[in-house]
Curated annotation (Swiss-Prot):
One of its GO terms (molecular function) is beta-glucosidase activity. Disulfide bonds: none annotated. The lineage of its organism: Bacteria, Bacillati, Bacillota, Clostridia, Eubacteriales. This is Thermostable beta-glucosidase B. The active site is at D231. It comes from Acetivibrio thermocellus (strain ATCC 27405 / DSM 1237 / JCM 9322 / NBRC 103400 / NCIMB 10682 / NRRL B-4536 / VPI 7372). Transmembrane segments: none annotated. Signal peptide: none annotated. The gene is bglB.
Amino acid sequence: MAVDIKKIIKQMTLEEKAGLCSGLDFWHTKPVERLGIPSIMMTDGPHGLRKQREDAEIADINNSVPATCFPSAAGLACSWDRELVERVGAALGEECQAENVSILLGPGANIKRSPLCGRNFEYFSEDPYLSSELAASHIKGVQSQGVGACLKHFAANNQEHRRMTVDTIVDERTLREIYFASFENAVKKARPWVVMCAYNKLNGEYCSENRYLLTEVLKNEWMHDGFVVSDWGAVNDRVSGLDAGLDLEMPTSHGITDKKIVEAVKSGKLSENILNRAVERILKVIFMALENKKENAQYDKDAHHRLARQAAAESMVLLKNEDDVLPLKKSGTIALIGAFVKKPRYQGSGSSHITPTRLDDIYEEIKKAGGDKVNLVYSEGYRLENDGIDEELINEAKKAASSSDVAVVFAGLPDEYESEGFDRTHMSIPENQNRLIEAVAEVQSNIVVVLLNGSPVEMPWIDKVKSVLEAYLGGQALGGALADVLFGEVNPSGKLAETFPVKLSHNPSYLNFPGEDDRVEYKEGLFVGYRYYDTKGIEPLFPFGHGLSYTKFEYSDISVDKKDVSDNSIINVSVKVKNVGKMAGKEIVQLYVKDVKSSVRRPEKELKGFEKVFLNPGEEKTVTFTLDKRAFAYYNTQIKDWHVESGEFLILIGRSSRDIVLKESVRVNSTVKIRKRFTVNSAVEDVMSDSSAAAVLGPVLKEITDALQIDMDNAHDMMAANIKNMPLRSLVGYSQGRLSEEMLEELVDKINNVE
């Protein structure tokens, strides 16, 4: 960087430095013209640029300049395609350059704790590994164009209900393994210019003033060297926030918090060094944006629309396909049923709402793809304005379906059902849509349901339809992408990035979402999504990682290059995948790891690798994965680090979390010995489970139990069970004078210091 930032900071007044730490207006940073510090613009959003027009009111979020509306993250994640996500990110970066936007507010890497979260359509997955990998690709793509990405919302912002005030209570291990992990790899791997803190409190402190979150973890551990920005209006106490690591407040405070910062520095409440560090981080990004600015930048709208079409097609998930009803034949009569045909839901509502450069017409795209030999019949079926059942529309739909070879029913969630700002209260689609599907099933056996929704829904009619294609919110090229997949021009290759439960009550957060008053406790802990369903043995409607194809794939020959390794070693895993069908296609190979026996609670299995591979009919390829320590580790709160327990681990290769086709066993040996610290209140059983400690306590315990004639080897002896469960201090009373309190203290000290 040609600019000497430290020199500039020395030339800045205290007031200028404080002023740089809050916005100029809703979207810009403050300039300092006398020192050559420009103002830069940041704006939404994750799946398309939402730059509000200059004449638009702040609340008029739908009045923005035209931009390409790509599939939302919920859909794009189902592509499991790092390269595709990076290409979408690069396209977003190009559009930012064309509109003089320096920072794009996205991607969102929040975990899908509950299917009810109203903003889930903006997030990638329930799994932190998948989420962080795709977020990293998105960031790399955006920043490849000289535009900064803003990773958000850090952290534990997993609901819209009271999101600005709710206190999210999460234990440390769950934070590390689930909610932090979704951000960690993205920060370390892709180095986003900006990270946005969330609105909520985390374990009692607002994220905007949480030092542990913003400084200790994000900046010191993960080495984030950009700046931290508040979510819009998330600042509670500006001085405390700055001290904790919140560099930039957005939007403008109209000078109010600038004065508070100045007063805090003058009074000694806030160190000027902390202010200087925040200014340095902000200036670094501002000048990076300035250096990378492309004058008179333009982008190819048609090329971006084609990319949006490809991204949507590659993200669609074929959930069910009995009798190979899909792909559709390019002949005969096809009934297209549902108001979504004419007025599709292709994006979510809220701050990510895009004004598209163009919008495909689903009916026209299917008509064009089908050709002259296809006769299309359209029937509205239901009204989008309300959920009321219109029998006249249903009868018209039945008539259209009965006279057709196949009926394609478009269903899903209207805008009013899911949006930023509020959560759903159920997983149902509108009752008029459910009734329509049931009615069509009475007269037509070949039914395809196309779902347009941002998160999982219940499907009470699932056994009455032959095919279900999950299209999520597919962006402006949804129509063309649907035509490609329905007619087989594109072989569906998407797989679910989240579990579809049979019903809401099966979800692990069911009893604790959205919490009570201003507090929500994550009592399910680590067991989010498939980690819960698979461990609990609950059969989902469609499991995590599930997705069908128009072709068939076979797996064989799993191998590992090492079977017995230390935890700091690298293990390479390879597996062969062959296309044994008649159509070219892509398969997503998933690798899970299972700890066979652990002293701590762990999920049944966890995703630790995935690769998407293209195969022509008859073609076979070898897919290779590399596993390091983190693939086998859990977060140990005693040592405040990732730890692997010595033992056997299973490496599982699957088509989904529930369809495991190959497995191999490896032994991983820990290089870190963790010694528990015992006290007089430690249970006898816990001490005896440690071999070194047992060698010290064992003889003393045997002397006491022999005198009491207690058989400690008899698992059904009540007194033996009591002895095992009692604290060491209770042995004094049972010892009949053999063990004093002073002797016990010496014994505990010896136990803790034994080699």
